[in-house]
Swiss-Prot record:
Keyword Oxidoreductase: no
TPR repeats: 484-517
Key words of the record: Coiled coil, Cytoplasm, Cytoskeleton, TPR repeat
Subcellular location: Cytoplasm, Cytoskeleton, Microtubule organizing center, Centrosome
Record-level GO BP terms: cilium assembly; regulation of microtubule cytoskeleton organization
Gene Ontology CC entries for this record: centrosome; cytoplasm; microtubule organizing center
Binding partners and assembly: Directly interacts with tubulin-gamma; this interaction determines centrosomal localization.
Domain notes: The coiled-coil domains may be important for tubulin-gamma-binding and hence for centrosomal localization.
Protein name listed in UniProt: Centrosomal protein of 70 kDa
Major place of residence: cytoplasm
GO MF, any single term: identical protein binding
Length: 598
């Protein structure tokens, strides 16, 4: 072997040495003998290099290499100088590669931790933003609920005000009716006063005529022929005096005085009689006003007859009950008790029928339209009438029941009429359990009359053609085919408008804007906020990725795409070599190999 060869001895097992041929052993012995002759400096240099490699192996966790001197060559493998150099270079490159890979792994772990921390920060920020959004949603829900409560309160107030207005309108109508009634009474009283004044004038005129006739009679008596000397003298004196003094001269005579006093007394009596007659007339008029009418008088007479009949029947029943009680005390038989109970029940029924009869014949009851046929009235006997007298209640109650059932038809017709006259009014539906009431019908009629009067008063009311054009315009505007869908769509539009106004008001409060700010200002402020949020997101992305421009981001991603496949292949090879399944188990496995190499 030449001098360029190098002897490198490694320990091997005896079983392997026996399997090798003898030629290799002899060649190794020759090489070892030749290597002893090489220069000392090269040998020391190589030993130093191997020691440095051994130190590198020790730092990496492997067992150190040992240089053996003067030992049996059976247990060693000998390499030449070139293979030893290549082995040293391979060891160095492997060590450098492992250090580079470890540094790369360390950088990847650090970047992974950094990304995890940034991800945690972003998650915390997202959770904070989500919590803030939830808080804002809760605030919005509470504001919506408060707005709903305020709307309900306003609706209740409006309903109360409408009910109050209706009550005031009803009171106004009643006051108007009372005023008209009092006006009618005033007119009647004025008419009576005028008639009384006419009668007074007539009486006064009659009195004046009577006084004139008395005067004429008196003058006639005074001008009659005198029968005595005194009368002749008096007549001569009267003739000699002037015509203007005849009345005074005649007053001196006692006959004239007596006639005058008698006439004055008669006049006073007649005046007193006139006053008495006027007072009696006024009292009679008051009595006539307070007295019932002919119809009420008939009803009262019928009620008196019915009450007399009921009184007789009650007396008879009380007599029967007294007899039954005496019989019960004497006999104490059970059939008599049953008869007594039956009599009590009959008395209760009779009282109920009497109360119904009194209601039927009361002035408040409606007029009875039903009339019994003459044949039934003739065939019915007088005894039956005296005994019962309640046969007329059945047709009356039937007639009232028919009238009450016809109220529903009347309500339907009035509803149709109101739909034609006032379609914009939503009339309340009567409760099915309570039925139709006359008050509801009167309210419907009053509302229709009010609307008709208002239409007559307001001459500026549009005609039917303009109203139809407005309705058709609303149908086109709201995309509704029928008239019934206009009101729901309008309510929906108003509801959406209210929601939009509430949302705008909430945005104004959240953004700190004035309530008088326009929608354009709100939109511009929201756009500014979105722009700020987008800028923050872009800055966060730049902070995470590092570079500022897009091309550098693309380059970095391409570098990552080039690096990760090689790193993945390297890690897969390591996993296969070390026979493990997890990346975290690579470092412990390498440490174990390092410990085993020692």
């Amino acid at each position: 072997m030449t001098e360029g060869t190098q002897v490198f001895l490694l320990p091997i097992s005896t079983s392997d040495s026996t399997k090798e041929p003898l030629s290799t052993v002899t060649s190794q012995a020759q090489d070892s003998s030749l290597s002893a002759n090489r220069p000392v400096t090269e040998k020391q240099q190589e030993e130093a290099e191997w020691e440095s490699i051994s130190r590198l192996l020790v730092t990496r966790g492997f067992k150190p290499l040992c240089l053996v001197k003067g030992a049996n060559l059976r247990d060693f493998i000998v390499f030449d100088k070139q293979s030893s150099q290549r082995m040293r270079q391979a060891f160095k490159t492997l060590m450098e590669e492992t250090t580079r890979q470890q540094s790369m792994l360390q950088e990847l772990i650090e970047t992974n931790h950094q990304l995890k921390s940034e991800l945690q920060l972003e998650q915390n920020r997202a959770a904070h933003q989500e919590q803030r959004a939830n808080d804002l949603q809760q605030i919005m829900d509470s504001v919506k609920s408060k707005i709903g409560e305020l709307e309900d309160e306003s609706l209740n107030r409006v309903c109360q005000e409408q009910n109050r207005i209706k009550d005031l309108q009803k009171e106004y109508k009643t006051l108007q009716m009372k005023c008209q009634h009092y006006k009618k009474k005033q007119m009647e009283q004025e008419e009576t006063i005028a008639s009384l004044q006419k009668e007074i004038r007539r009486f006064a005129k009659e009195e004046e005529d009577r006084v004139i006739t008395q005067k004429r009679l008196f003058t006639h008596l005074c001008r009659r022929v005198p029968h005595s000397v005194l009368d002749k003298q008096q007549c001569g004196e009267d003739d000699s005096q002037s015509e203007g003094k005849d009345y005074l001269n005649l007053g001196v005579s006692p006959t004239y005085k007596g006639l005058l006093t008698s006439l004055q007394k008669q006049l006073e009596k007649s005046n007193s009689k006139i006053d008495v007659l006027l007072g009696e007339k006024l009292n009679l008029q008051k009595d006539l006003e307070n007295r019932p009418t002919e119809h009420e008088l008939r009803l009262y007479k019928q009620q008196v007859k019915k009450l007399e009949k009921t009184l007789k029947k009650n007396i008879k029943l009380q007599d029967l009950i007294g007899q039954k009680k005496s019989d019960d005390m004497e006999k104490k038989d059970e059939p008599s008790k049953d008869i007594h109970q039956q009599a009590l029940v009959d008395q209760r029924y009779f009282q109920v029928l009497c109360s119904i009869d009194s209601i039927v014949h009361s002035p408040r009851a409606p007029g009875v339209i039903y009339k019994q046929s003459k044949e039934r009235a003739q065939n019915r006997s007088k005894d039956a009438v005296q005994e019962c007298g309640f046969e007329h209640l059945v047709p009356v109650i039937e007639m009232w029941a028919d009238e009450l059932t016809s109220l529903k038809d009347l309500y339907k017709s009035l509803k149709i009429l109101s739909a034609e006259l006032i379609p914009w009014h939503n009339l309340k539906k009567p409760n099915e359990n309570e039925g139709v009431k006359v008050g509801d019908l009167l309210l419907m009629v009053d509302t229709m009359l009010e609307e008709v009067e208002n239409q007559k008063e307001t001459s500026s009311m549009p005609n039917s053609q303009t109203l139809q054009a407005i309705v058709s315009h609303f149908q086109k505007l709201f995309d509704v085919q029928s008239l019934n869908g206009v009101y729901p769509r309008m309510n929906e539009v108003y509801a959406r408008l209210g929601e939009m106004n509430n949302a705008v008001r909430n945005l104004q409060e959240l953004l700190g804007l004035d309530s008088s700010s326009s929608l354009c200002m709100v939109v511009s402020t929201v756009g500014k906020l979105c722009k700020m949020i987008n800028e923050d997101v872009s800055e966060q992305i730049k902070r995470v990725l590092g570079p500022e421009d897009l091309q550098s981001i693309i380059n970095k991603l391409e570098e990552h795409e080039e690096f990760f496949p090689a790193f993945q292949a390297f890690t897969n090879d390591l996993l296969e070599i070390l026979e493990i399944d997890d990346l975290d188990a690579i470092v412990p496995a390498v440490k174990k190999l390092k410990v085993l190499s020692y």
